[in-house]
């Protein structure tokens, strides 16, 4: 059977609902909202990490306590943050990041990622929607809309809980899209400043650069995308004072 999964953002409500089979032509996942965005993705693509990462997230949610100080979620830069608990002690933190995450499949996996947790704050990072691969890449404006939808949903589900948005980092592997990353960061910064006190923009991009604005490659591992221990220390220096007050 073929179906379309639809994520609808109303003025004050966000919910998921399947469309009937006679309305569909192929397996698609559609994101729509009052901020006027519609994005269809193959369900097969959205579920590509079900066995590799999502299944583990589901299993961990059954044994981890619901109460926590901070939930970190997003893509592999979160998942690979091995010193997360030590870096933010004595806070209780949970790591809900998974490799390859995009805003598109984070909408699809929203309930799984959030699960039963009741955090006092969120920290979000994801940089996989802007790519040099045309089969994955989406326009900056479309990504901005998807981000707004995600944060609007969190505000409805977790009223008053701050969300720290980590700016998209520049890296050598994706240097060709640096201007687009900067554009997205600028849009998110302005949106956070204008929207509400719940979304806080954190510049985690500039600290990874040299004094002349170039990418500091000494802060990255060999793939030139992910941070090494020194790179994460730069993030901790910025984030820790915000989370531990």
For the regions a protein language model found, what residue spans apply to each?
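Charged, glycine-enriched surface loops/patches
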Residues: 141-166, 183, 187-201
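Catalytic nucleophile-elbow at a beta strand-turn-alpha helix junction centered on a G-D-S/GDSL motif
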Residues: 67-83
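Proline-centered flexible-loop/turn and helix-kink motifs
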Residues: 9, 89, 118-119, 159, ...
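Short amphipathic alpha-helices and their capping/turn segments at secondary-structure boundaries
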Residues: 59-70, 107-116, 152-155
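N-terminal secretory targeting modules
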Residues: 1-70, 86
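Oxyanion-hole/transition-state-stabilizing segment in secreted/luminal serine hydrolases
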Residues: 78-87, 92, 105-144, 168-172
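Catalytic His-Asp segment of secreted/periplasmic serine-dependent ester chemistry enzymes
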Residues: 169-245
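Structural recognition of the beta-strand scaffold that forms the well-ordered cores
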Residues: 70-73, 93-97, 121-126, 162-167, ...
């Amino acid at each position: 059977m073929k179906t379309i999964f639809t994520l609808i953002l109303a003025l004050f409500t966000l919910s998921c609902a399947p469309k009937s089979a006679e309305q569909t032509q192929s397996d698609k996942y559609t994101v729509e909202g009052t901020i006027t965005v519609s994005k269809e993705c193959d369900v097969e693509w959205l579920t590509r990490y079900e066995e590799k990462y999502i299944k583990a997230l589901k299993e961990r949610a059954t044994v981890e306590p619901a109460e926590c100080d901070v939930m970190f979620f997003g893509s592999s830069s979160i998942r690979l943050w091995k010193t997360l608990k030590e870096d933010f002690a004595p806070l209780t933190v949970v790591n809900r990041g998974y490799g390859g995450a995009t805003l598109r499949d984070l909408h699809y996996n929203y309930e799984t990622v959030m699960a039963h947790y009741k955090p006092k704050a969120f920290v979000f990072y994801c940089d996989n929607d802007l790519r040099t691969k045309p089969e994955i890449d989406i326009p900056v404006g479309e990504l901005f809309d998807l981000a707004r939808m995600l944060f609007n949903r969190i505000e409805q589900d977790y009223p008053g809980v701050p969300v720290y948005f980590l700016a998209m980092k520049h890296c050598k592997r994706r240097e060709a899209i640096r201007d687009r990353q900067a554009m997205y960061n600028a849009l998110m910064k302005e949106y956070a400043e204008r929207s509400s006190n719940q979304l806080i923009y954190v510049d985690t991009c500039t600290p990874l650069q040299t004094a002349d604005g170039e990418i500091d490659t000494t802060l990255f591992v060999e793939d030139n995308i992910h941070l090494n221990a020194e790179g994460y220390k730069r993030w901790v220096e910025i984030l820790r004072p915000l989370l531990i007050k």
